[in-house]
UniProtKB/Swiss-Prot annotation:
Localization per Swiss-Prot or TrEMBL: Cytoplasm
Species: Nitratidesulfovibrio vulgaris (strain ATCC 29579 / DSM 644 / CCUG 34227 / NCIMB 8303 / VKM B-1760 / Hildenborough)
InterPro entries: Chaperonin_GroES, Chaperonin_GroES_sf, Chaprnonin_Cpn10_CS, GroES-like_sf
A Pfam family recorded for this sequence: Cpn10
Record's protein name: Co-chaperonin GroES
Gene, per the UniProt record: groES
Keyword Cytoplasm in annotation: yes
Known function: Together with the chaperonin GroEL, plays an essential role in assisting protein folding. The GroEL-GroES system forms a nano-cage that allows encapsulation of the non-native substrate proteins and provides a physical environment optimized to promote and accelerate protein folding. GroES binds to the apical surface of the GroEL ring, thereby capping the opening of the GroEL channel.
Any Gene Ontology CC annotation: cytoplasm
Keyword vocabulary terms for this entry: Chaperone, Cytoplasm
Length: 95
């Protein structure tokens, strides 16, 4: 499936959550929190400002980002979990 976000929407693929703690303990699936970082798969063209001009997106495909853990709408593409969210829900780009 090919998905192209509109306006200021971003398609993000979540990164896998940690399998074990820093101390070496394995975390069961039921106790894992969903990660709040991921990779931008696709981004829309941007949003239209009040004056009618297009405000370009800051993020682009391939960027690693940090986002609010309740951000976006979960969807599955070819069995892989993704999120569609607004660019405003992205807190930072990880460099």
């Amino acid at each position: 499936m090919n998905l192209k976000p509109l306006n200021d929407r971003v398609l993000v693929k979540r990164l896998e959550s940690e399998e074990k703690t820093a101390g070496g303990l394995y975390i069961p699936d039921t106790a894992k929190e969903k990660p709040s970082r991921g990779e931008v798969v696709a981004a829309g063209p941007g949003k239209t400002a009040d004056d009618g001009k297009l405000v370009a997106m800051t993020v682009k495909a391939g960027d690693m980002v940090l986002f609010n853990k309740y951000a976006g709408t979960e969807i599955k593409i070819d069995g892989v979990e993704h999120l569609v969210m607004r660019e405003d829900d992205i807190l930072a780009i990880i460099e």
